[in-house]
């Protein structure tokens, strides 16, 4: 006679009733998102209101917070998209009926230096697109700061976004200024910018000799690996519904490698590796063509160190 398999006492009956309705809670007796959100839609506590004592943009559109910086970001998105779409899709040889993925917006010619192109001149559309994209990125970062202030959170999210934003600034603003010409900015366009990235490495002999390139790639790959390990562990342990779930996750990594960095630690470590990788990539780009013209010759100092004498 067949018998039903006995339940493991560590795995309680975790069946639950799903509350009907969009975005509803799955926890019995819990509150829906719609019930919770109003408590956190707090007026004030923004950078704009802290300076001017009033923020006319301190409101929400549905679940989305607007704020002054959200408004600034939307303005940047609208005008930046206009210049980009107009130049790469609506005009030029790569219009809609053709391969607009190959459309490009070239930076100003070298002879313009750090000047500003007049409307209709080469480089004008590039400068306008870069200007409004920079405004949009900065506004989005500051909007994240405002939301963090409202919720009394740390500033880890806007800092991480700001580090990604720094890569754009280095490529399109800081490095061109350091080299004295906007022409050193990268070409805008889906396929052309990939060609620019490929050619950039060859300009300085062998980019694999660039130590900051290696450190940046290591940081990005390591953060991906760390958070993939963390995500797979959480999914595996999610099958266990007991109160000791966190302990089980720590025990797993102690069994695997004798040490567990902990739930908070793995997020912190992935965060540090990710932003560290981008900051290293910033140096990788900034130093190329400015103080360093050839990354292979850059390593000549190693052979001239005094402790190699006589070797």
Curated annotation (Swiss-Prot):
Localization: Cell membrane
Principal location: membrane
InterPro entries registered for this protein in UniProt: Photo_II_D1/D2_sf, Photo_RC_L, Photo_RC_L/M, Photo_RC_L/M_CS
Membrane among keywords: yes
GO terms (BP aspect): photosynthetic electron transport in photosystem II
Membrane topology: Multi-pass membrane protein
GO cellular component: photosystem II; plasma membrane; plasma membrane light-harvesting complex
Keywords per UniProt: Bacteriochlorophyll, Cell membrane, Chlorophyll, Chromophore, Electron transport, Iron, Magnesium, Membrane, Metal-binding, Photosynthesis, Reaction center, Transmembrane, Transmembrane helix, Transport
Residues engaged in binding a ubiquinone: 253
Superkingdom of source: Bacteria
Classification via PROSITE patterns: REACTION_CENTER (PS00244)
Binding of (7R,8Z)-bacteriochlorophyll b, residues: 183, 213
SUPFAM superfamilies for this protein: Bacterial photosystem II reaction centre, L and M subunits (SSF81483)
Binding site for Fe cation: 230, 267
Transmembrane residue ranges: 68-90, 123-151, 156-178, 211-238, 262-287
Any Pfam family the entry gives: Photo_RC
Any GO MF annotation of the entry: bacteriochlorophyll binding
Functional description taken from the UniProt entry: The reaction center is a membrane-bound complex that mediates the initial photochemical event in the electron transfer process of photosynthesis.
Family: Belongs to the reaction center PufL/M/PsbA/D family.
Subunit structure: Reaction center is composed of four bacteriochlorophylls, two bacteriopheophytins, two ubiquinones, one iron, and two highly hydrophobic polypeptide chains (designated L and M).
Protein name in the entry: Reaction center protein L chain
Organism for this UniProt entry: Chloroflexus aurantiacus (strain ATCC 29366 / DSM 635 / J-10-fl)
